[in-house]
Amino acid sequence: MNRKKGDKGFESPRPYKLTHQVVCINNINFQRKSVVGFVELTIFPTVANLNRIKLNSKQCRIYRVRINDLEAAFIYNDPTLEVCHSESKQRNLNYFSNAYAAAVSAVDPDAGNGELCIKVPSELWKHVDELKVLKIHINFSLDQPKGGLHFVVPSVEGSMAERGAHVFSCGYQNSTRFWFPCVDSYSELCTWKLEFTVDAAMVAVSNGDLVETVYTHDMRKKTFHYMLTIPTAASNISLAIGPFEILVDPYMHEVTHFCLPQLLPLLKHTTSYIHEVFEFYEEILTCRYPYSCFKTVFIDEAYVEVAAYASMSIFSTNLLHSAMIIDETPLTRRCLAQALAQQFFGCFISRMSWSDEWVLKGISGYIYGLWMKKTFGVNEYHHWIKEELDKIVAYELKTGGVLLHPIFGGGKEKDNPASHLHFSIKHPHTLSWEYYTMFQCKAHLVMRLIENRISMEFMLQVFNKLLSLASTASSQKFQSHMWSQMLVSTYGFLKSISNVSGKDIQPLIKQWLDQSGVVKFYGSFAFNRKRNVLELEIKQDYTSPGTQKYVGPLKVTVQELDGSFNHTLQIEENSLKHDIPCHSKSRRNKKKKIPLMNGEEVDMDLSAMEADSPLLWIRIDPDMSVLRKVEFEQADFMWQYELRYERDVVAQQESILALEKFPTPASRLALTDILEQEQCFYRVRMSACFCLAKIANSMVSTWTGPPAMKSLFTRMFCCKTCPNIVKTNNFMSFQSYFLQKTMPVAMALLRDVHNLCPKEVLTFILDLIKYNDNRKNKFSDNYYRAEMIDALANSVTPAVSVNNEVRTLDNLNPDVRLILEEITRFLNMEKLLPSYRHTITVSCLRAIRVLQKNGHVPSDASLFKSYAEYGHFVDIRIAALEAVVDYTKVDRSYEELQWLLNMIQTDPVPYVRHKILNMLTKNPPFTKNMESPLCNEALVDQLWKLMNSGTAHDWRLRCGAVDLYFTLFGLSRPSCLPLPELGLVLNLKEKKAVLNPTIIPEAGVGNQFSSSQDEEEVDMDTVHDSQAFISHHLNMLERPSTPGLSKYRPHHHHHHHEHKKKKKKHKHKHKHKHKHDSKDKDREPFAFSSPASGRSVRSPSLSD
């Protein structure tokens, strides 16, 4: 962006420097969902001829702008409100993505742009030439905001405080412009004064220190005054207002927690742990928490579970739990720890540009991982790393790669570093949400690779150095260059690494930062007895999408009879075969213990081994020091030894996965041994349950004895005297609790020779439910009971229909009747005694959908639609919507698809709207290569309109709509559309115009919006309309002139008049009102309604 290689300092893209901002919201109306207030920005011009100031502001109605108390004219133009002209017949995604990327760049603060352009009054020009301070005062209001601020107003009786009404800021990446005018960039830091006037019964929580709370004379309202003296980006400013209950942390008085009424006991328990997280981070970073206070606010209808802002974090209220809940506790603690890690890197230390985002996400994810290792142990940490690695590998192979450090400009290729994607990665607001999630995942994994290279000690020293520099800078009064120490850049971070460690990590950076893709290894081996050598063959696939070629060191661990040996191979360009000398001679007769990797010595039964080979098992890249997928071939007995005796949980998980392909009595025995071993990591034992079920099904004809796991379960959890009755619940040992609730779910997957669930298993599960007794247990059994319902659902197999008879409740299969009765009983009980997070209702809804899909009960979406309505708990709604999405796909129901699309547009909860798009993308009703009755012109238009103008208030939602459009129709024009008339196409990649019958002019999108300095020539007092501007440029193509920006420039003025002439023809809905004569124009701001007024997005019209 603004950073050339080797460039040290930060150069602002703006011709001024912001030093302080005041935000004052003096009226909040919960009834109307409106906000009124003003902002005041203190700026220092950095160039002499500053006559235009660009700021960010979306959906705010701007009433008046004054600079140093003089009225200033301003223009509001937001091309992202409607990306492509509504008249346009374009329907191909390539065109949209280019236009959208251009629209976002046109208002991108990191390119010095903004939606609001203010003209500096001529009286101040001399003042500006002397680079003296300017104070910009903007009065604004927000009416029923669709993004940025979220109002939750329960429709019950009582005052707003009694109803628990609250409002909070939210959004994806830099979204502060949605609720007040600002420079919405992570690189523009300033100090803040924040004031909020609310009803006396409400509490306003914001960033920084609460300086004072002042009541009005009538005591009906009060104003909260916050000061944030640490320079902070507007994007890290937040707000939450509601009738919160307040808890000062008993261990750390500078920490305060807020929750909605009646939840204080849960808040006390949930946050009782947070001081330990503080202590951990301060200790490893050898640096104090950077702010003077920290606030946690738990709110309803959260945008994301955790949102970190300067000195405060906003959490979902669903994370709160009591001491009786087991499963939620680690999840909530992880959320708290993530939020705190981001306080240091993300809020306190910000980024220079979007291409440096990976550093912040990487460091915060990495130190969060260290916290996890300390809190949950090394096994859990390794399991998490493996899980994250599998996720990123699967995503990159599916989509073609995630690029951590996209550098723009320069060479042709670099301009579009992600041509395999259907969206631009040049800007956070054009990214698919899933891509961004995977981006964060890859960032922390790469940080771990850097740690492997330079050591943890050096890594923490680098972080400490970054924090110390930032800390020194933050305490300085405003000096133009000091605060840039609080911004991290890729260059600065890498330089710091080489200074501290003295190591060259350039190859690693080149491999994982500057290119996308993961590595795919295929390994096999042969033992050469004569030479006593292991001949290892390692192949790579670097031609498939999402892969890259790896050259460098690769660790291989070989467990032999005499111990475990590590070898480092050098993977060269073409080398495939590697000879590794063996240390042990092949097996001797004398009985001897075998030393393992961790120094332990164990007795093994070696009868399964090959007589002339000393090899027990082999592992490639055991430390996961390459982002890779490994497919390794070794004999079944080697996997069995590895599962039993290798102490690394990742190796055990990998062997379990491999053993699915070897359904033999020996595999069965190895898995059963693991299930019985109490020292074994609980997640490995849980995986073993499911693997054992798969193996049992493959061996069904030769299986002897009771169904898999049944006797084991009986021995562990049932009464000695009466084996079919389960003991009273006692969940004191969490390991056995997780095993107890997983085993029945896995057993329900067992099938007999006729591919039905054995009657014995079903009876066993029904007995577990019937005799479940939680009276003496100090923990809740809601998750356990929910898993029992999942087990019932797993036992269901497809219905066999006789003479196409219609299924009714009278002719139900007797087993299915039992299952349905249990589900109904559970659902009714839930209405009387709801479980924590309604886990049981969620499982029941999923089970009913399974019965429908298997043809046991009539397929119908109405039950799910009633549960999906606003007002139900969010987990229930998501489960119900999942079922409706599935029904839409299976039954090809246009009606339900319309119902879902309607919900995406009208549902009050942003998270639910996002989830519906997400579920439709993951389980689409049809895809681009399918013929489907659902695919028609009306649907194309509807989705096009949704992403073009219907989601302008929420970046995440718009990118979700783009993902869905891509899944359904692909990149080019949807196949179900009629062929358009002959048209001229400008092929951007080839840079030539061609005639094409299938596509309407795909004009030079890059030229639609321009952010270059030449724009200053535009007459500010003529209303500047982006849509007209674009349509004019499209018309230019019909003329013989070469499409180049310079050629377009002279037409600026002329296009306004041309547009007026054409207005009737186009039926535009723009209204331009010039209230004042030309004399007054300079002084008075003109009234003007935004280009997109009257369209589907409520746009901020500007008036006096």
From Swiss-Prot:
GO CC annotation: nucleus; transcription factor TFIID complex; transcription factor TFTC complex
Alphabetical UniProt keywords: Nucleus, Phosphoprotein, Transcription, Transcription regulation
GO biological process: mRNA transcription by RNA polymerase II; positive regulation of DNA-templated transcription; positive regulation of transcription initiation by RNA polymerase II; regulation of DNA repair; regulation of transcription by RNA polymerase II; RNA polymerase II preinitiation complex assembly
Cross-referenced SUPFAM superfamilies: ARM repeat (SSF48371), Leukotriene A4 hydrolase N-terminal domain (SSF63737), Metalloproteases ('zincins'), catalytic domain (SSF55486)
Location within or outside the cell: Nucleus
Pfam families recorded: TAF2_3rd
Cross-referenced CDD domains: M1_like_TAF2 (cd09839)
Modified residues (Phosphoserine): S1090, S1093, S1099, S1101, S1103
Segments of skewed composition (Polar residues): 1090-1104
Domain of life: Eukaryota
Comp. bias regions, Basic residues: 1048-1076
Keyword hit for Transcription: yes
Keyword Transcription applies: yes
Predominant cellular place of this UniProt entry's protein: nucleus
Region feature Disordered, mapped onto this chain: 1040-1104
Family to which the UniProt record says this protein belongs: Belongs to the TAF2 family.
Function recorded in the entry: The TFIID basal transcription factor complex plays a major role in the initiation of RNA polymerase II (Pol II)-dependent transcription. TFIID recognizes and binds promoters with or without a TATA box via its subunit TBP, a TATA-box-binding protein, and promotes assembly of the pre-initiation complex (PIC). The TFIID complex consists of TBP and TBP-associated factors (TAFs), including TAF1, TAF2, TAF3, TAF4, TAF5, TAF6, TAF7, TAF8, TAF9, TAF10, TAF11, TAF12 and TAF13. TAF2 forms a promoter DNA binding subcomplex of TFIID, together with TAF7 and TAF1.
PANTHER family: TRANSCRIPTION INITIATION FACTOR TFIID, TRANSCRIPTION INITIATION FACTOR TFIID SUBUNIT 2
Subunit structure: Component of the TFIID basal transcription factor complex, composed of TATA-box-binding protein TBP, and a number of TBP-associated factors (TAFs), including TAF1, TAF2, TAF3, TAF4, TAF5, TAF6, TAF7, TAF8, TAF9, TAF10, TAF11, TAF12 and TAF13. Interacts with TAF2C1. Component of the TFTC-HAT complex.
Protein name: Transcription initiation factor TFIID subunit 2
Species lineage: Eukaryota, Metazoa, Chordata, Craniata, Vertebrata
